[in-house]
Amino acid sequence: DVASREAQSIRPVPRPTAGEENRNYRFNWDSPFAISHHDPATIYLGGNHLMRSRDRGTTWEEASPDLTKMIDRDTVSIMGRLVTDETLSRHDGISSYGNITALAESKHSPDVLYVGTDDGNLQVTRDQGVTWTNVIDQVSGVPPRTYVSRIETSYEVDGRVYATFDGHRNDDYSPYTFVSNDFGSTWRTITNGLPEGWSVNVIREHPENSSLLFLGNEIGLYVSINAGGSWGRMQNNLPPVAVDDIAIHTRENDLVLGTHGRSIWILDDITPLQELSDQVLASAAHLFGS
């Protein structure tokens, strides 16, 4: 409450079960959450389970089983060695391992949800979480256990979903970027024009033009006007900086970038970009709207 300054925590707490009296959820340093496109009272939060609240966070339910690979991080070697209690900076900077790092709800149906994890799972449900399918094996060329950095569902095309992966923690800086048009059953890569050596943090589709995509990586902003067929860097006065998040202000049609250490950047009124196409670029002249 802004006026009274009253606040309360809405973080879900697991209920003890038989044989698991000390259950704990595993949350990422940047746990993803989302407000439903279909019901503003419904909130999703990623732990190792997908959590769902139908009353703005007052109560929570598990909308999934554990969607991770459930790997004990103490069994994962670092440079060929297992960590011990004596290891300096043990798990430094890693709050937990085996948790949800990306989630998205279909903009066409509340039944369809997508989840990505830090240990490389890509899960989809089409019945509000009753059953889940791990479709990561359908994503060609991504090494096992690669961190899922973002999932984006299409405003226009039902069944279309984008996914990006970030392998820099394993010394892999490939720009893994994919699209599926069948709810994740098959995927194809859309990296033409993206520079090698810079991992991808985020991808967004324009709400009114499904061919207009924006992508943030470790050195800046990239744009596609042909649904990912090709990408070009968009810089102007934007410094070379990691773009961690992208939002499109639907009322003002502004492009908003969240960067790593260089503040928030806003490009006012991207209507000309919204109208841009290969045909416009090939024409002798074009009058853009306002």
Regions found by a protein language model. Name each.
Residues 1-290:
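Beta-propeller blade termini and top-face loops
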